[in-house]
């Protein structure tokens, strides 16, 4: 998530400054299969790994053999003397360590250069600059046994400066011209050359429907309890839709599109359609699912809390402090940014960014009580106390503000339910069951 956030924030900054941004997404051919064992041992030694651990890893790769199963039978065993183990939980760490050692002399400060496993992104302000850096990376990696994929590597040009002349040069790996694209799927999130998120919104909805169809045997089965269907949806389908939404500069039209898709899923789970004229709130209460828009707010605030608690010199904090260039703002309304969306979320819920600091909450009891007015934790002790409290209070009509309450586990900066600024004990407790 951090890499996606960095890339979107950099694109927002360049768009505000009206400066062109050039990106190349590099893919390594059979990255795990091309790692020389000698380079692996040297990288471990250079990083100061203990000798005992190095010997343990060497034992894992010593005298490794495999066979190939075909229609004609199984082949004889043959040794494997190169590459990392496929499927091993240790392999991604070893590969990252090797790549870091091989490129430590040419790496630049993020976000100018971003590495995530075998996915490499290089950023530049011109094609010529990008070509120079790409050639440097090619020499550094291909001289050690790796190979940059000519077919899967792609180039994207973000033309935020409409008055700048287009360069005639091409972005190349050696003699091969890298194809230019208008959007690229980076770590599961669709990045567009105009900095917008429409492509990613549509992709998330499609991914959610694909997951929903795979589970339709359960979700559409009339014999399965409706509450179990809701729990299955919250566990398997909704996280697929919400992936990457923390980094969206979301607009109301995007929220509407995602909300409509979710309601279609929930209605089909209940065996209902819009022609049955059942309100959305009744469907949600029956299934036990809160509006996905509120979950998007929760995820944004949770991620905002993680970012704010990071050290000031971390890359996710430095990208927000990039110096603005002195440019003349163009005509029209400025484009919405992630920070503007977060600021609006905080203002609508009377929250302060200082609440993200753990030490502030520990020292300021008033701030802690205020924040707890917006966050519901699903602790066993609190659940028991709330049940006792409900039994002692006269049952009232359902409150629309309580419909967003949920019982999922939350981290500190989660906003699972956004309620008015009312003390906890003075809130009206409804008889309707909590749903999330």
Where are these regions (language model features)?
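Conserved pre-catalytic core of RNA-dependent polymerases
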Residues: 1-93
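Short linear motifs embedded in intrinsically disordered, charge-biased segments
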Residues: 51-54, 68-88, 92, 99, ...
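Charged catalytic carboxylate motif
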Residues: 2, 6, 98, 133
């Amino acid at each position: 998530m951090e890499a996606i956030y960095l890339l979107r924030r950099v694109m927002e900054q360049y768009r505000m400054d009206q400066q062109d941004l050039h990106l190349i997404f590099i893919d390594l051919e059979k990255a795990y299969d091309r790692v020389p064992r000698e380079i692996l041992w040297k990288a471990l030694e250079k990083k100061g790994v203990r000798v005992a651990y190095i010997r343990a890893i060497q034992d894992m790769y010593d005298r490794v053999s495999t066979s190939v199963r075909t229609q004609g039978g199984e082949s004889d065993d043959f040794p494997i003397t190169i590459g990392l183990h496929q499927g091993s939980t240790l392999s991604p760490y070893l590969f990252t360590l090797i790549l870091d050692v091989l490129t430590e002399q040419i790496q630049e400060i993020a976000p100018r250069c971003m590495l995530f496993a075998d996915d490499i992104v290089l950023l530049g302000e011109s094609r010529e600059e990008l070509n120079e850096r790409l050639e440097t990376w090619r020499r550094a990696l291909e001289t050690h046994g790796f190979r940059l994929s000519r077919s899967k590597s792609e180039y994207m040009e973000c033309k935020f400066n409409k008055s700048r002349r287009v360069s005639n040069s091409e972005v190349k790996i050696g003699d091969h011209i890298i194809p230019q694209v208008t959007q690229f799927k980076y770590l599961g999130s669709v990045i567009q050359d105009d900095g917008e998120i429409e492509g990613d919104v549509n992709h998330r909805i499609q991914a959610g429907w694909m997951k929903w169809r795979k589970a339709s045997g359960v979700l559409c089965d009339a014999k399965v309890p409706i509450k179990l269907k809701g729990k299955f949806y919250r566990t398997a389908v909704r996280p697929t839709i919400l992936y990457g939404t923390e980094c969206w500069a979301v607009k109301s039209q995007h929220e509407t599109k995602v909300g409509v898709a979710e309601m279609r899923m929930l209605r089909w789970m209940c065996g209902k359609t819009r022609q049955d004229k059942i309100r959305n709130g009744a469907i949600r209460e029956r299934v036990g699912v809160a509006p996905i828009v509120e979950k998007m707010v929760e995820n944004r605030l949770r991620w905002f809390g993680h970012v704010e608690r990071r050290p000031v010199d971390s890359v996710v904090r430095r990208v927000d402090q990039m110096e603005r260039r002195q440019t003349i703002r163009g005509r029209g309304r400025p484009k919405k940014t992630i920070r503007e969306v977060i600021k609006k979320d905080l203002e609508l819920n009377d929250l302060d960014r200082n609440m993200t600091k753990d030490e502030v909450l520990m020292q300021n009891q008033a701030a802690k009580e205020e924040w707890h007015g917006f966050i519901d934790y699903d602790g066993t002790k609190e659940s028991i106390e709330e049940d006792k409290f409900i039994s002692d209070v006269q049952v009232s009509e359902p409150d629309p503000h309580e419909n967003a309450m949920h019982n999922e586990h939350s981290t500190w900066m989660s906003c699972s339910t956004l309620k008015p600024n009312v003390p906890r004990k003075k809130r009206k407790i409804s008889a309707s069951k909590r749903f999330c």
